[in-house]
Amino acid sequence: MAKAGIILKQVLETYGISQSDLAKVMGIQRGNIHRWVNELADPASTAIIEIRDALQKINPAAARAFIELWLDSSEPET
């Protein structure tokens, strides 16, 4: 799950969503988002769904991209 923060940062930048906006919709402090996107902490597995749900409210395409990228990064390399 170490790549979740990298993926979140990419999605936020691609879709023009601020860390503050995501934090507000999630009902958490912006510092949590900051730690995730700067790889200082990994979001808990339950937070992945909360991130998806918040992104869905802000921009459904961003939510789809986040989950698709996260699932793709979870597949073992062959």
Labelled PLM ranges:
Residues 1-15, 25, 52:
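A short, Lys/Arg-rich alpha-helix, primarily the initiator
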Residues 8, 19, 48:
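Helix-turn-helix DNA-binding elements, focusing on the entry/boundary residues of the two helices
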Residues 21-23:
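Short alpha-helical "recognition helix" segments of helix-turn-helix
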Residues 27-43:
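Recognition helix of helix-turn-helix/homeodomain-like DNA-binding domains
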Residues 45-65:
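DNA major-groove recognition helix of helix-turn-helix/homeodomain DNA-binding modules
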Residues 61-78:
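Short, charged recognition helix plus adjacent turn
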